[in-house]
A protein has these predicted regions:
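C-terminal helix/juxtamembrane-tail motif
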Residues: 387-396
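Residue-level detector of intrinsically disordered/flexible regions characterized by low predicted structural confidence
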Residues: 4, 94, 395-396
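Short, basic/low-complexity N-terminal boundary segments at the transition from targeting/disordered tails
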Residues: 17-40
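Fungal secretory targeting signals
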Residues: 1-24
Length: 396
């Protein structure tokens, strides 16, 4: 979703003492301090479902964008242990942390860690203790708790850099980013850095091109062509893991779905059906925030059913990857019906936005938002643990 957090604020000049390596040289990466597990098996498509470690089933997952932006290993472990106890199978984590200059050293979690510096001279990867060592630990630890990760490479929104960091450095725009030669070269270098670093790990569920990519006012072919190009590139680097787009699921008029209003009009440059047909995208995702899009909450059930039907027509799995409502500690009335609709549908999985741990050294409310469901709260027993159990028990 469009995060409520402030992006990393560039205030300091680039420090040459920092452990930065040009993204032009991904083969020169320093080795991780933490081993990546190759035990078990890589997740893969099984019809309209997924095979995870030899088991084909429906399941629930969650989002924890902040996980690799925590400085404490114990906080990561605690969060993973609570997700595993819930019955979640996958967790979506930001695989990006972009800035134009390093954040102030006085920053605290989750605004201290950054993975990439972008400026007019190029892109530089931070392999230090406040950089990819944090993502290294997340990938390492996920295996210990039997969880698999969805890692994305860039944010449509300005939080934690995103496309705005590329536009600031290389003078592309939020729409030309997808076709600009320089921006795409740097983006692909970052993709290569992350994919080649973690491709041996069975903890990776899927690579994701971006968080909620949009190209407002563009022909939908712009993003479809970009998604085809980047997913093919990822497959050339790693043919063993799945790839997905990370979009909100907008339909276009050509799809013949819906009433032609905002979610169906293609104004954000997305044609969900056309993108789902891309051979190098293994499954489709969609998000659900009616309050942000001008729809009522009951419409969410229709949105779920429409994506299920379209996914069935194409023959690929579909995940409701994000959903939330702005009612802190009071989400059951609005989100419970959506979960019931998912249970009745052929949707393979859903991932609520978002998970809030209990007991971390940094208060979970620091990186939580109005949509967060917090572990051990009354609503969590229903929307978290209860729903995960119901999904896993659903007959295949």
């Amino acid at each position: 979703m469009k995060s409520l957090f402030t992006a990393l604020v560039p205030l300091l000049p680039l420090a040459t003492a920092l452990p930065l390596v040009s993204s032009e040289s991904p083969n020169a990466q320093p080795k991780s301090l933490y081993p990546f597990s190759s035990s078990g098996s890589n997740a893969k498509v099984a019809g309209r479902l997924f095979n995870i470690d030899g088991k084909v089933e429906y399941f629930a997952g969650t989002n924890a964008w902040w996980l690799a932006h925590l400085s404490s290993n114990s906080d990561v472990d605690l969060s993973f242990s609570q997700m595993a106890a819930t019955g979640y199978k996958i967790v979506r984590v930001w695989g990006f942390g972009d800035a134009n200059t390093p954040p102030p050293s006085t920053n605290t979690d989750p605004n201290l860690v950054y993975f990439q510096i972008l400026n007019s001279t190029g892109s530089y990867i931070n392999y230090g203790a406040d950089g990819l060592q944090r993502l290294d630990y997340v990938v390492h630890a996920a295996s210990k708790y039997g969880l698999k990760l969805v890692l994305n490479f860039v944010n449509n929104w300005g939080d934690y850099g995103g496309i705005a960091a590329y536009t600031n450095a290389f003078n592309c725009s939020s729409t030309s980013f997808y076709t600009d030669a320089t921006c795409q070269k740097v983006y692909k270098n970052y993709v290569k850095t992350i994919v080649t670093r973690y491709r041996s790990s069975t903890a990776i569920f899927a690579w994701e091109l971006g968080n909620e990519p949009r190209c407002n006012g563009c022909e939908t072919s712009v993003l479809t062509n970009w998604a085809s190009d980047i997913s093919s590139y990822i497959k050339s680097l790693d043919s063993n893991h799945m790839v997905t787009l990370g979009d909100e699921g907008w339909f276009a008029p050509a799809d013949g779905i819906g009433d032609g209003s905002y979610a169906y009009g293609g104004a954000e440059g997305i044609d969900w059906v056309a993108n789902l047909k891309i051979k190098t995208l293994d499954y489709g995702v969609f998000h659900l925030y009616p309050n942000s899009w001008g729809y009522n909450y009951t419409w969410g059930n229709e949105w779920i059913e429409q994506h299920d039907k379209a996914g069935k027509a194409v023959g690929k799995p579909v995940i409701l990857e994000e959903y939330g409502t702005p009612f802190p500690y009071n989400h059951i009335e609005t989100e419970g019906p959506w979960q019931a609709t998912v249970l009745k549908s052929g949707i393979a999985a859903d991932q609520i936005w978002q998970f809030g741990p209990n007991g971390t050294s940094v208060s979970a409310e620091v990186f939580g938002d109005v949509n967060t469901i917090y572990f051990k709260t009354p609503e969590y027993a229903t929307l978290g643990t209860g729903h995960a159990k119901a999904m896993s028990k659903k007959k295949v």
